[in-house]
């Protein structure tokens, strides 16, 4: 088997005066022999001189073989290899995007991890709370919950990873919840306990009684 042979490359410091290529597999030559045909062959409006690559020399020779009266030229090769083309420069990079379902699952798993981490911190905080701070609030009024905007609160929220411009912190009779703009609810099991009043009402609710039995007469006839 023959080994791979790397072709020899020829280089020019100033580059080809037509296409501006600075390297070629063929030698560069002086452009004096072809300068008189540059205007018609390449559609140039200025005089160019210097080195010329073999590819541009072949284009000049091909132009000379065109039939008389032909207006064909190779203006598109002028300065074509001066640098990266505009198309290459402005071409946006392809970014691998995940599907919507995969992104959503990743966000959910990340949220669950944050919940676990913050729940462990919240549990150690709530376990040492005084009885007055228990989840059963007996002194609250009947007109609902004490709603606080999380962005306006001075204390640091337990869930520091939440978007405070979207979630509202609400203190209800069963504890503390975070409510979203569209009705979503986030609950921390360490800060949310069943309401004492609901338990008491369920215990005091009389059991449903069936129909009273008809009295049995004991009189002898």
From Swiss-Prot:
Its main location: nucleus. Keywords: Nucleus. Residues 136-152 have a biased composition (Polar residues). Residues 124-135 have a biased composition (Low complexity). Pfam families: FAM60A. Residues 112-152, 201-221 are annotated as: Disordered. GO terms for cellular component: Sin3-type complex. This is SIN3-HDAC complex-associated factor. It comes from Pongo abelii (Sumatran orangutan). The lineage of its organism: Eukaryota, Metazoa, Chordata, Craniata, Vertebrata. The gene is SINHCAF.
